[in-house]
C-alpha cells in the first residue's frame, strides 16, 4: 500500500502515478522548451528554457522550480549562458546560475567559464573553471571551485 502525501485520498507513490512531459518550439535561431515531471520520485519539477543564436553568439536562459511531495524541499533557480564562436575551431563559454531553497532561504550560486577546441568533425577538447558558493554550509567548505579538462568524440 502506498502513501497519500497530498491527502487527496489517492496513493501518490505507485509506479503509474508519475508523469513526464516536454514541449518545444524552434524557429530559425530561436529555441523554446518547457518540460516537467509530476510525482516522479516524490518530486514535481518544472523547467523552462530559451535559447537564441545571433551569428557567432548563442545566448541561453533556464528557469527551474522543484518541489518534493514530502514538504522538505521547494527550490527555484535560474541559469544564464553564453557561447561565442571565435573561429571554426574555438568556442568560448560562460554560465551563471543560482538556486534558492524557498523553505529556508539557502542559496547556491555558480559561475563557470570555459572553452571548446574542435579537433575534427566529431571530436573536441574542452576546459572549464567553475566557482560555487553555498549559503547552507556554515564552514570553510561553503565556497569551492573545480577545474575540468576533457575530450568528447561523437560516434
Predicted regions located by residue number:
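Outer-membrane beta-barrel proteins
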Residues: 1-155
Amino acid at each position: 500500500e502506498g502513501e497519500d502525501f497530498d491527502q487527496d485520498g489517492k496513493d501518490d507513490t505507485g509506479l503509474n502515478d508519475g508523469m513526464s512531459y516536454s514541449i518545444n518550439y524552434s524557429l530559425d535561431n530561436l529555441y523554446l522548451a518547457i518540460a516537467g515531471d509530476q510525482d516522479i520520485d516524490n518530486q514535481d519539477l518544472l523547467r523552462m528554457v530559451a535559447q537564441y543564436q545571433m551569428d557567432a553568439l548563442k545566448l541561453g536562459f533556464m528557469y527551474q522550480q522543484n518541489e518534493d511531495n514530502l514538504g522538505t524541499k521547494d527550490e527555484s533557480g535560474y541559469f544564464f549562458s553564453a557561447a561565442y564562436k571565435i573561429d571554426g575551431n574555438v568556442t568560448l563559454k560562460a554560465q551563471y546560475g543560482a538556486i534558492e531553497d524557498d523553505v529556508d532561504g539557502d542559496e547556491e550560486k555558480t559561475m563557470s567559464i570555459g572553452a571548446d577546441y574542435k579537433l575534427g568533425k566529431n571530436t573536441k577538447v574542452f576546459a572549464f573553471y567553475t566557482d560555487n558558493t553555498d549559503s547552507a554550509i556554515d564552514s570553510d567548505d561553503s565556497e569551492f571551485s573545480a577545474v575540468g579538462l576533457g575530450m568528447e568524440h561523437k560516434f
